[in-house]
Amino acid sequence: MREGFIGITFPAVSKPDSVVPGWRYWPANALTLINLGAGALVCWWAASEFDLGWAPAEWLSSLGWLDAWMEVLGEDKRRVAGLIWLLVVWMFGQLCDVLDGAVARAMGAQGAQGAMLDSMADLVSSGLAPAFVGMALMMEWQATGVMPDGVASFTVLPLTVLMAAAWRLARFSRQAVQGPESQESNGDKRFDFEGLPAPFAALFWAGLVWTWAQCPGVGCDGLWILGMLGCTLLPLGMVSSLPQVGLKHWGQDKRWDAMRGVWLLAVGSVSIGLGPLGGVLALISYPLFGAIAHRFGTSK
C-alpha cells in the first residue's frame, strides 16, 4: 500500500511494496559473517602446527587472557585450555549459523544473496574447519601410534568432508536461487534437509575433539574408529538425498514434534550420562533417526 503525498500524487516514483530496507539484511548477515570468521580462526589454529590446542593457547597468551581462561575452566593444562577455547569459538560460530536464518525471516530480509552468503560461511566453518581439525586429529593419532599401521596413511581422508560440504552447499545455493518449489525436503514439512546438513560435520568433529581433550592418557584409543567414520560415512551422508529432520518446521505436526522431543530427551540423557563420548554417540544417532523417520513415516 502506497502512503504519503509523494506516493499518492506520483505513483510512478513510489517504491514497490516488496522493497526491503537495506539495514534489515545486516543483522542476519552479521551473524553469518561471524560464523565465517569463527570458522577461519579454527582453520588457522588447526593448521598452524597440526598440533591441536597449542595454537589457540598461544593466541590467548598473546592477548593476556590465557591465565584468566584457565582459571575460569579450573584447568592447569595449557593445551586442553586451548582446545576448549577453539571449541567455544567454533560453536559460537555454529550458534550464529542457527540464528541467522531465523533473524532474516523475522526481519523480512530473506533473499538469494543471504542464502549464498550463508553457504560460503558454512563452507569455511563446516567444511574447511572440520577437515583441518580432522587432519590434525588423525596426524596426532598416527604420531602416538594409536592408529593401526594399515590405516595410518589415511590422515588426509578428512579432506573429503570439505569436498562433501562444497557439493552439498552448492546444491543448497542452487535450490535457493530456483525458488521454493525446489527447496530441500521437497515440500515435506516433516523434513528440513536433503542429506546431512553441513554444520553436522562441524558438530561431529568438535565432539571428537571434546572427547579426546577429556581423555586421560590413552583412555580413548578407539576414537580413531569414529574418526574414520567421520571422513567416510559422514561425507557420503552429506551428499546423499536422504531426508533429514530438523527444527525449522516445529509446531506444524504434533506427532512429529513428539517424536523429535523424545529423541532430543534421549540425546540429552545420553550426553549427560556418558559425558563427551555420549555426546558423540548422540550425534551419530541423528542420521539414524532421520533414516528411521523417512523409512517408517507416511507422506501426507
Summary of predicted features, one role per range:
Residues 28-33, 77-84, 88, 106-172:
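Multi-pass membrane catalytic core of lipid/isoprenoid biosynthesis enzymes
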Residues 37, 95, 99-103, 120, ...:
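Active-site His/Glu-centered metal-binding helix of metallohydrolases
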